[in-house]
UniProtKB/Swiss-Prot annotation:
SUPFAM superfamilies tied to this protein: S-adenosyl-L-methionine-dependent methyltransferases
Organism: Lycaon pictus
Keyword presence, Acetylation: yes
Known partners and oligomeric status: Monomer.
Identification of the protein by name: Thiopurine S-methyltransferase
Length: 245
């Protein structure tokens, strides 16, 4: 039997009961940046996004693209360089400042009037705006609607108990004709507490299926040596494309 196929077709766990009460605070996420525990950051960008970029963009120009829990994702620069307008939200000010520094972009910063303590960082070119605040506070900032959402490291990072609220916010930000690209991870949740959390396909359909057509574009075995420390022996990344029903 083909070993790769065996891994990629591994049976999904029916629910996330074992992880449902797991909670990380915003302060804990900020501490991850300070202590450099940011293994989720991909310096070369996301391979599956690169591969399916044309499917995601559909050859359209001047799109508004949203990055939830953006960190310092290099893909934000990719989209900006293609002429699109990028908006991200990230709780770590350190992560946002590192993005601009590492991409050699000058920027301005100002307070978010609607969110006490929040800040918005804007590239001097004007096509990248990063909000430093909780994603769950973001609706108060009236950031408008988006043509595209790239959700990698966001749904899998928020506390499982917050997923319904998260999905409602994401869908409220979509514009007619939107494309939403989601990357999730499949592993044995009884062996790793997360994050990243395990999000089964059934829950994805429950959260987004009433509004979206859901199509799995690809499954990839992404298991690496570092994952052994999680106590797991396989991890599959799945890429989904949501389109408007």
């Amino acid at each position: 039997m083909d070993k790769t196929r065996t891994f990629l077709d591994v049976k999904e766990y029916p629910d996330t009961e074992v992880q449902k009460n797991r909670v990380l605070t915003l302060e804990e996420w900020q501490e991850k940046w300070v202590s450099r525990r940011i293994g989720f950051h991909q310096e070369q960008g996301h391979k599956l996004l690169k591969k399916h970029l044309d499917t995601f963009l559909k050859g359209e120009n001047g799109l508004r693209v949203f990055f939830p829990l953006c960190g310092k994702a290099v893909e934000m620069k990719w989209f900006a360089d293609r002429g699109h307008s990028v908006v991200g939200v990230e709780i770590s000010e350190l992560g946002i400042r590192e993005f601009f520094a590492e991409q050699n972009l000058s920027y301005t910063e100002e307070p978010i009037v609607e969110i006490p303590g929040g800040k918005i960082f804007k590239s001097s070119s004007g096509n990248i705006s990063l909000y430093c605040c909780s994603l769950f506070d973001l609706p108060r900032a009236n950031i408008g609607k988006f043509d595209r959402i790239w959700d990698r490291g966001a749904l899998v990072a928020i506390n499982p108990g917050d997923r319904e609220c998260y999905a409602d916010i994401m869908l409220s930000l979509t514009r007619k004709g939107f494309h939403y690209l989601l990357a999730v991870l499949c592993y044995d949740p009884t062996k790793h507490a997360g994050p990243p959390f395990y999000v089964p396909e059934a829950e994805i359909k429950k959260l987004f299926g009433s509004i979206c057509n859901i199509h799995c574009l690809e499954k990839v075995d992404v298991f690496e040596e570092q994952h052994k420390s999680w106590g797991i022996d396989y991890i599959i990344e799945k890429l989904y494309l949501f389109t408007e029903k």
